[in-house]
């Protein structure tokens, strides 16, 4: 026997000892750092395009300027509508490269809940990178709304980082309790479980369905294109999960629930293969019942593949950060969402 024989090495050393040797070699090479037995969290690396760092968070006006700056023959930006405070809600269309095939429409939104900044940054990365690549199906028209609730988002930047809802004034005597949970304002089982009729509640469903312009313009877009839309994805944070409808009550399932769940599992496998963050696929109501949500509404229109993606674990470097996802996690989160979305898009066009 010779110690140069790999099979002998395997027989002589136990797997745990081999792992220690490998770890020591990596440490010696400077490739990893161990802190309390774990690899370090990702570090911040800027990705600047047109003076706009895609791996950072930005004011709404700067986002609009950036979107306008990256338009080309394939990528167009327009206003889907305006918010209660008259801010534009941008929608970006990345057109299909191959117009000879039947088109498939895919819709993604982000930022319905104002404090969930990571969803907005992820959507902006999707817009820029997918508009410059051809590794996704050539007959897909991709629509992305990166900041669905611009008023609330700006409020989190200037006043209250933890604000969730819109900023509409519901009545003169309610100025101290402004806004509605835009993701409880859709006209499907509106005002049901997981909502509140208290205007001061974070889950206030609003005075009527689609009372909020932020929800109304998205609902109108979806309903007008329900026949061509095959995918609806809403980006939120945080839970490390892909949510499968319905969420308006426990045990409510669309007819194709099993197929939706299997596809969601394929998406989580693609995500987890990158950084091992252990995304799971669950029914929406398993997280908590919530009626009047955009995903349930989209599914009620007959859109086939409908998901809400709850991004990140709410932790960084072993510390709880909640909704305040550090910019260090933007690139990693984008990579994971891109992997899931590509998996979903390829499955859609192969049917």
What are these regions (language model features)?
Residues 1-31:
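Classical eukaryotic N-terminal signal peptides for Sec-dependent ER targeting/secretion
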Residues 20-351:
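M14 metallocarboxypeptidase catalytic domain recognition
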């Amino acid at each position: 026997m010779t110690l140069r024989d790999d099979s002998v090495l395997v027989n002589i050393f136990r797997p745990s000892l081999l792992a220690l040797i490998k770890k020591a070699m990596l440490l010696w090479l400077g490739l990893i750092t161990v802190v309390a037995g774990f690899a370090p969290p990702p570090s911040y690396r800027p990705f600047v395009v047109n003076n706009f760092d895609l791996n950072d968070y930005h004011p709404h006006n700067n986002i609009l300027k950036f979107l306008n700056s990256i338009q080309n023959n394939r990528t167009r930006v327009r206003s889907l509508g305006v918010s209660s405070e008259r801010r534009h809600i941008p929608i970006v269309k990345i057109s299909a490269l191959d117009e000879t095939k039947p088109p498939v429409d895919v819709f993604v939104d982000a930022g319905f809940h104002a404090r969930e900044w990571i969803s907005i940054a992820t959507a902006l990365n999707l817009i820029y990178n997918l508009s410059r690549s051809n590794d996704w199906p050539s007959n897909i028209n991709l629509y992305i709304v990166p900041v669905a609730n611009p008023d609330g988002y700006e409020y989190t930047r200037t006043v209250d980082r933890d604000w969730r809802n819109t900023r509409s004034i519901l009545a003169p005597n309610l100025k101290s309790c402004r806004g509605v949970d835009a993701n409880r304002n859709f006209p499907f089982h509106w005002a049901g479980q997981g909502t509140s009729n208290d205007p001061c509640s974070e889950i206030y469903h609003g005075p009527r369905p689609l009372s909020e312009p932020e929800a109304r313009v998205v609902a109108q877009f979806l309903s007008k294109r329900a026949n061509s839309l095959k995918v609806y994805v809403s980006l939120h944070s945080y839970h490390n999960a892909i949510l499968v409808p319905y969420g308006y009550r426990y045990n409510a399932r669309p007819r194709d629930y099993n197929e939706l769940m299997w596809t969601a599992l394929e998406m989580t496998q693609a995500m987890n293969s990158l950084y091992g963050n252990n995304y799971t696929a669950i029914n929406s109501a398993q997280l908590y019942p919530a009626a009047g949500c955009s995903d349930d509404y989209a599914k009620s229109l007959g859109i086939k593949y409908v998901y809400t993606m709850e991004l990140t674990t709410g932790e960084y470097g072993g510390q709880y950060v909640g909704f305040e996802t550090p910019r260090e996690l933007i690139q990693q989160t984008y990579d994971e969402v891109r992997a899931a979305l590509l998996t979903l898009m390829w499955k859609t066009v192969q049917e």
